Amino acid sequence: MAIKKYKPTSAGVRGMSVLSFDEITKTTPEKSLTVSLNKSGGRNSYGRVTIRHRGGGAKRKYRIIDFKRNKDGIKAVVKSIEYDPNRTANIALLQYEDGEKRYIIQPVGLKVGDVVESGADVDIVPGNALPLRNIPVGTTVHNIEMKVGKGAQLVRTAGAEAQLMAKEGKFAQLRLPSGEFRLIHLDCKATVGQVGNISHELVTIGKAGRNRHLGKRPYVRGSAMNPVDHPHGGGEGRAPIGRPAPSTPWGKPALGLKTRKKNKKSNKYIVRRRKK
């Protein structure tokens, strides 16, 4: 999708850009594939904030996405390409030969009228889903399962892609967008191609109001707070941190601290850690 830039007619639109949405063919979602979405405002069941900077935003309906791609051997036609407010990628509405409709994440190049399918022996074309053991080495993939039959969990955001590097024993080795090399079972499914809406990362928000529409609240610097609210707070004017290293609001090290568990069970599947 192309990027549309605005003339600086006001401070709000100066430098602002939006996606052109020229790929979108339908503006209203398939009603049978949507459910209501209750907002939490970042609060848990006790009403306490557990994730900061969330709240407000436009009302949304959640689109039910088919991450399992388990209708093997049944062809589907792409009926429409739609916008999904719940994710960065666009979604494609499929209609199968038996009449069932499902949403999938739109890969690059998938358009209305294309035919896609899933199964062990389908063609290697964008949008088709098949087990990793049947995908040639060097192929670009997305929507990758981590456990057989659980549904895709990896490489789902706009513009993301992974590459199948090798196969050995029961596992395939993939290079993920982070640079991590990871082992995935050969029976796990993946979808051929790169996730669409590549231009998403080039969008400039431009003004605070657009972030509020997305449900994002302001991120306040610790140095702008009082000492009671943050370890960086207080002082006269622009005071330094006053500590050996930056801290989180709860007093823990903010930079450089490893947050992954050292003895995590899945560590054995990581061949090479991600690039920093």
From Swiss-Prot:
Domain of life according to the entry: Bacteria
Keywords, comma-separated and alphabetical: Ribonucleoprotein, Ribosomal protein, RNA-binding, rRNA-binding
Pfam families membership: Ribosomal_L2, Ribosomal_L2_C
Gene3D superfamilies assigned: 2.30.30.30, Nucleic acid-binding proteins, Ribosomal protein L2, domain 3
MF terms (GO), sorted A to Z: rRNA binding; structural constituent of ribosome; transferase activity
SMART domains in alphabetical order: Ribosomal_L2, Ribosomal_L2_C
SUPFAM superfamilies for the chain: Nucleic acid-binding proteins (SSF50249), Translation proteins SH3-like domain (SSF50104)
Region (Disordered) location: 218-276
GO BP annotation list: cytoplasmic translation
HAMAP family assigned to the protein according to its UniProt record, in alphabetical order: Ribosomal_uL2_B
Function text: One of the primary rRNA binding proteins. Required for association of the 30S and 50S subunits to form the 70S ribosome, for tRNA binding and peptide bond formation. It has been suggested to have peptidyltransferase activity; this is somewhat controversial. Makes several contacts with the 16S rRNA in the 70S ribosome.
Family per record: Belongs to the universal ribosomal protein uL2 family.
Assembly and interaction partners: Part of the 50S ribosomal subunit. Forms a bridge to the 30S subunit in the 70S ribosome.
Record-given protein name: Large ribosomal subunit protein uL2
Originating organism: Finegoldia magna (strain ATCC 29328 / DSM 20472 / WAL 2508) (Peptostreptococcus magnus)
Gene: rplB
